[in-house]
Structures are given as structure tokens and as C-alpha cells.
Amino acid sequence: MAERQTGTGPGPVTRTHRHHAPASGGACSNLLRRIQDHVPNSTQLVGFLTLLISGGILLLLTGLTATSAAMGFVLFAPLILLTSPVWIPLVTIFFLLTAGFLSTCGFGVAALAGGTWLYRYLSGRHPLGSERVDYARSRIADTASHVKDYAREYGGYLQSRVKDAAPGA
């Protein structure tokens, strides 16, 4: 910031330094020079002022909201306490009916989607995910076949071992 380029045209560029006027106190002059070197530019100043104004507005709105909530609670607390034996059971029944209705609708949609998928799968239309079901079925069949072969192989082995242990059997 202390250096500025001067010159016009293709000639040599010279740099001039901005010198501060000497003050009477050496330490005070040094402090002022440091402060002047760190002065924010206009963009930073406008950003800071915007932040300050926005923060003040939000703080004011927060105070108004908290105050109105407290005043509303103070004014309506007796009314809420006096009428609670009437509206608490009504709200509970309404909540349970709404939850039951929405659960029934959700289960109905899930059953309809599952039934549609199963119908498409069994009719051979190959719905989304049928390849995975076919793969799982083939894996289960392969595993059952291996278990069956293993049982045949080692089942005969165990029967011969039993005959060795009890020759008359």
C-alpha cells in the first residue's frame, strides 16, 4: 500500500513511497502508522455494517418473539388449565384416529404394491428386482443340492462306521 507505480508509456517504471509526516512523539507516530496500514477498505466496511445491521434486526426479532411467547403463556395459561379436561381427551382421540387411518392407508399401499409385483413376477413380466429373486432362488437350490450330496457321501460313511462298531447290526 505504501508503494505506487507511476509512469506513462513504455519507459522505465519508477516507484514512489508515501512518507508519513513525522510526529512529535516517536512511539505514537509508529502506532499511528501501524493503525493506518491496517485500515479496512470500503468493501470490508460495507460488509461489516451489513452484518451489524442484520444482526441487530435479528436480535430485535428474537426479543420480540420471546416477549410475545412469554406474554401469550401468561395470558393463556389459565384458559389452558381450566379447559384441559375437555380438550386433552379430544386431542388424544383425534391423534389416535389419525395415526390409525394413516397406518391403514400405508399398509394398504404396501400390500397393493407387493401384490402387483408378485402378480407381474408370476406372470413372467420381470418386474424390477426379479433378477435378484431368481439369483437367490438359484443359490438356495444350489446350496440344497450341495447339502444333499454331502449327506449322501458322509451318510454312507457313518453307516459303515456304525456297522464296524456293531457288526451284527
UniProtKB/Swiss-Prot annotation:
Its membrane topology: Multi-pass membrane protein
Keywords per UniProt: Acetylation, Lipid droplet, Membrane, Transmembrane, Transmembrane helix
Any one Pfam family match given in the protein's UniProt record, by short name: Oleosin
Subcellular localization(s) per the UniProt record: Lipid droplet; Membrane
Cell division is among the record's keywords: no
Record bears the keyword Transmembrane: yes
Name recorded for this polypeptide: Oleosin
Organism: Lilium longiflorum
Lineage, uppermost ranks: Eukaryota, Viridiplantae, Streptophyta, Embryophyta, Tracheophyta
